[in-house]
A protein has these predicted regions:
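Generic hydrophobic, amphipathic alpha-helix propensity
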Residues: 8-17, 33, 58-66, 132
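Hydrophobic alpha-helical connector segments
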Residues: 72-102, 151-158, 209
Length: 209
C-alpha cells in the first residue's frame, strides 16, 4: 500500500527535491532544506528520522506522483494509433528517468535494504508493463505490429540503455556534442531515445509508412 504523506511532509519533500536537483544529495544540507522550507532543523528528524531516510521518502513520493501522472498521460493518448502510443510511452519513461536522474545512485543502494521502495517501484513497473502489453496487442490487431514480444522485455529494453546512459557519462560524452551540462543531458537523452525507439519498433516488426 502506498504511504500517505501529510501536507507538511509534502512541503518539505518538494523543497528538498528542488535543492537536491540543483546541488545533489551530498551538496544539500539539512540546514538548507529546513531554512528554505521555513521549519526548524529538528522537524526533519521528527518527520523523517534523518537526511538519508528523507531521501528514501522523497523517492517513494516521486514514484507515487509519477505513477499518477503516467496514468493521466496514457489516458490522453488512448485514442491514438498504436505506434504513436508506443512512441509516446517510450519517450515519457525515458524523459522521467532523465528528469529525476539524481535519484539513481541513491536508489540502487537504498533498495537493497528498503522493502517499501521496492514495492513502489514494482507497482510502477507493473503499470508500465500492462500499458505496453495493451498497446502491443492493439498494434497486432491493427496490423501495424508484426511481432508481439513480452511487454516486460520491452520495458527492460527501455530502462536498460537509459540507466546505462545516465550512470556512465564519462563514456557517453565521447559520442555527443555539448558545451554545458544541460546540453549534455539533452543530447544524451535524445541519443538514447532514438536508439530505444529504433530497437523497440524493430522488435515489434513495425515499419513506418
Amino acid at each position: 500500500m502506498s504511504k500517505k504523506f501529510t501536507d507538511k511532509q509534502i512541503h518539505i519533500l518538494n523543497v528538498a527535491e528542488e535543492l537536491i536537483a540543483k546541488k545533489g544529495f551530498e551538496g544539500t544540507s539539512v540546514r538548507e532544506i529546513s531554512s528554505k522550507a521555513e521549519i526548524n532543523v529538528a522537524m526533519i528528524s521528527y518527520y523523517f528520522g534523518s537526511k538519508e531516510k528523507m531521501m528514501a521518502y522523497l523517492y517513494q513520493f516521486r514514484v507515487q506522483k509519477t505513477r499518477e501522472h503516467f496514468a493521466e498521460f496514457t489516458e490522453t493518448i488512448k485514442d491514438a494509433k498504436p505506434q504513436m502510443q508506443m512512441r509516446e510511452v517510450i519517450k515519457y519513461i525515458v524523459s522521467q528517468l532523465f528528469k529525476y536522474n539524481y535519484f539513481h545512485g541513491f536508489v540502487t543502494q537504498e533498495m537493497r535494504q528498503t522493502e517499501h521502495l521496492k514495492n513502489e517501484l514494482m507497482e510502477f513497473y507493473e503499470i508500465c508493463v500492462a500499458k505496453i502489453d495493451d498497446i502491443t496487442k492493439k498494434g497486432i490487431a491493427a496490423g501495424v505490429f508484426t511481432f508481439a514480444p513480452q511487454p516486460e522485455d520491452i520495458l527492460t529494453l527501455i530502462l536498460g540503455p537509459t540507466l546505462f546512459t545516465i550512470r556512465n557519462r564519462k563514456f557517453i560524452e565521447i559520442f555527443v556534442v555539448y558545451n554545458t551540462d544541460e546540453k549534455y543531458m539533452q543530447e544524451a537523452e535524445k541519443k538514447v531515445k532514438a536508439y530505444i525507439l529504433m530497437s523497440v519498433f524493430a522488435l515489434l516488426g513495425y515499419v513506418a509508412q
